Amino acid sequence: MGGVATLRFHKMPTGCIVCVSHKRNQDGYFRYSIGSSRKGEKKHFMFHRWVWEQHKGPIPDGYEIDHICLNRGCCNVEHLQCIPKRDHIIKTNKERKLVKK
């Protein structure tokens, strides 16, 4: 019988808090699952979104959680902001252009 892996974190000099016990997905985010897949009760979530909701409350429809620090693996609530999806898309596209230069 397998157990649930314990979440472990590291605080970086930048203030980012990253999970060191789990791998990031192909997009650079941490996903976490709780519950039993045998019973069909397993829930998957993006960890930074879960952290936001635990500290700040529900994410309104049409809004997304943005990493102010640009580190998709960061789950420091001080480095997260809740912004409209459209603004998030514009911000992300601007950041990608800066990285390409």
Curated annotation (Swiss-Prot):
Tree of life domain: Viruses
Pfam families assigned: HNH_3 (PF13392)
SUPFAM superfamilies: His-Me finger endonucleases
Name this protein carries in UniProt: Uncharacterized gene 5.3 protein
Gene: 5.3
